[in-house]
């Protein structure tokens, strides 16, 4: 059960993490997936469907960049709606983590 909780927590913050990464710089999906796999141990298979969903929701948009080592790369960038969503999710995340920390701290 603890592993299931960890997986659900990671999935719950995945969109926030992607939006935060893209707020710093445009990126392609493999680069985002590699970073999230390394930093929060999230499987790449979860990230690609999320990127497609975020695009269809209007949070990100794509453009192609020629690559010297193969086919063009599809880069993602935040839209104005994506920036608004990031700010809202950051606010919710801070409030949520403060509440959880208060509860967990009180139980210690």
Region roles according to the model:
Residues 1-2, 76:
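A positively charged, amphipathic N-terminal helix/segment that binds anionic biomolecules
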Residues 3, 84-108:
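Amphipathic alpha-helical dimerization/coiled-coil segments
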Residues 6-48, 65:
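N-terminal helix-turn-helix DNA-binding core of bacterial DNA-binding proteins
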Residues 49, 53:
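Alpha-helical DNA-recognition elements
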Residues 57-72, 77:
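Beta-hairpin "wing" of winged helix-turn-helix
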Residues 78-83:
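Accessory beta->alpha helical hairpin/"wing" motif in late/C-terminal subdomains of nucleic-acid enzymes
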